[in-house]
A protein has these predicted regions:
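Mature extracytoplasmic enzyme cores
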Residues: 1-232
């Protein structure tokens, strides 16, 4: 989510934040970060943050078009969580012995949110893994476009419990596949996304998978490199 933060008119080192349901002035957090560069000296940059996340530099392309004077933009992303253990989750995933074990390992995966296709000798499954933000029903923009950072209802309220993320095990079709399409047709209690991939690609993929009773490495290569568009 992109947040528009209002700079304190009386002190440009502070911004307006909601504290205990009251708009109050708060210090902008500042820290030095060293970017390591192979075979070259590291580069030190200054990172500024609000409660909603890092502040984007005003030189960012197009930012001045949406940020009014006296304001700045901060970005919230699950990947900024200092407790992010996504890399460890992926390493542990490679040591999984079955679908259930793999599903359990992905609880530590934070970002980016992904669909994982899991297969063992007896089961096939799709597991949505990653930290999916929870937003208030009163959130002004639902994360679709920038919102004011000092409005309480616009703040994230946490993340969807991993155990409630969509999980499909052994579907009747006998196929698990995904092309960024919506993976469940039924009503889902938690919001995940407003935008999904088109239906043409998943239809084409499903058709190719259903054409053969048995697949080989080459048949999967052919599917991966397929360029036919149903729409065209």
């Amino acid at each position: 989510d992109l947040y528009i933060e209002k700079i304190d008119p009386s002190n440009n080192k502070k911004y307006l934040s909601n504290l205990n349901n009251q708009v109050q002035s708060k210090e902008i957090k500042t820290r030095q970060v060293i970017i390591e560069i192979k075979d070259l000296p590291g580069k030190t940059i200054t990172v500024q943050e609000t409660d909603n996340g890092p502040i984007l530099p005003d030189t960012f392309p197009g930012l001045k078009d949406i940020v009014p004077p006296g304001h700045m933009a901060a970005i919230s992303w699950p990947g900024f969580d200092p407790n992010d253990r996504s890399l460890g989750a992926l390493i542990n995933l490679m040591y999984s012995s079955n679908v259930k074990n793999a599903k359990d390992k992905l609880i530590d995966f934070h970002s980016p949110i992904q669909n994982f296709l899991l297969v063992d000798k007896e089961n096939i499954a799709i597991q949505v893994a990653g930290k999916i933000p929870l937003r208030s029903k009163s959130h002004a923009t639902k994360g679709l476009y920038p919102s004011l950072g000092y409005i309480p209802d616009n703040a994230w309220t946490g993340y969807i419990n991993y155990q409630n993320n969509p999980f499909i095990l052994n579907p009747p079709s006998g196929i698990v596949a995904n092309t960024n399409n919506k993976i469940i047709d039924r009503e889902f209690p938690n919001h995940i996304s407003y935008e999904w991939g088109d239906s043409q690609r998943i239809l084409r993929l499903t058709n190719l998978l259903e054409k053969r009773e048995f697949h080989t490495a080459q048949s999967f290569i052919d599917i991966q490199t397929d360029t036919i568009s149903i729409t065209a």
